[in-house]
From Swiss-Prot:
Gene3D superfamilies: 3.40.50.880. In the presence of PdxS, forms a dodecamer of heterodimers. Only shows activity in the heterodimer. InterPro entries: Class_I_gatase-like, PdxT/SNO. Transmembrane segments: none annotated. Pathway: Cofactor biosynthesis; pyridoxal 5'-phosphate biosynthesis. The keyword Lyase applies. It comes from Syntrophus aciditrophicus (strain SB). Keywords: Glutamine amidotransferase, Hydrolase, Lyase, Pyridoxal phosphate. This is Pyridoxal 5'-phosphate synthase subunit PdxT. It holds the Pfam family SNO. The gene is pdxT.
Length: 224
């Protein structure tokens, strides 16, 4: 494992074991950010922030152990690396999982797997998030978990009815939905800034937004 505290870290890594790896990388590239796949210990070199994509949390946790990455993630985190977990990634980061043992346990919260129901209960909505965007933000929920409790050091970014869907502390960001499956780059931009990295000005992103939309399967998804 190579992750030195004094090394120059200006890259965002995406854990390349399962989930929307390509989609996360595309969003980061649209922001003009240096990014790469992380699949082995040497890949942590130069990584300022790591994204844990969605997928299936139990399978993802097992793959992390098989590839000997759990110690690498925890070591890099202790040395300053930021982490963002989406959907299953958020489950891995929680200190408490209803009915299960926790995995990495890096943010003080309790989470419920499949809190919104089965795959057939997946949906897309828009929500106001004035802290991050002047416009409504599209949210895609796919067999998503629900955050039921957060600790005193955790800030709620977005709450819908009686459950939390986005939260963060100084080092960790969690979203139970999939920002990488919409053209919106609001959450990727927020995470990049959290990692102390500058990105492409928003005015320069209009063309890339249109290009992403034209090839995205999400334009066919039902909206509620």
């Amino acid at each position: 494992m190579i992750y030195r505290e004094d090394s120059r870290r200006n890259t965002i890594g995406v854990l390349d074991l399962q989930g929307g790896v390509c989609e996360h990388l595309e969003h980061l590239e649209r922001l003009g950010i240096a990014c790469k796949r992380v699949k082995e210990p040497l890949d942590f070199e130069g990584v300022a922030g790591l994204i844990l994509p969605g997928g299936e949390s139990t399978c993802l946790s097992r793959l992390i152990r098989i590839f000997h990455l759990e110690g690498c993630i925890l070591d890099a985190f202790q040395k300053g690396m930021k982490i963002w977990g989406t959907c299953a990634g958020a489950i891995l980061l929680a200190t408490g999982i209803l009915g299960e043992r926790p995995h990495l346990g890096l943010i003080d919260m309790d989470i419920e797997r499949n809190g919104f129901g089965s795959q057939l209960d997946s949906f897309c909505i828009e929500a106001a998030l004035p802290e991050l965007s002047a416009d409504p933000v599209p949210l895609t929920f796919i067999r998503a978990p629900k955050i039921r409790r957060v600790g005193s050091d955790v800030r709620i970014l977005l709450q819908l009815q009686d459950y939390i869907v986005a939260a963060e502390n100084d080092r960790v960001l969690v979203t139970v939905f999939h920002p990488e499956l919409t053209p919106c780059i609001v959450f990727h931009k927020h995470f990049v800034h959290k990692c102390g990295i500058c990105c492409t000005p928003e005015d320069d992103l209009a063309d890339s937004d249109a290009q992403w939309n034209s090839r995205s399967w999400m334009r066919l998804a039902p909206h509620v």
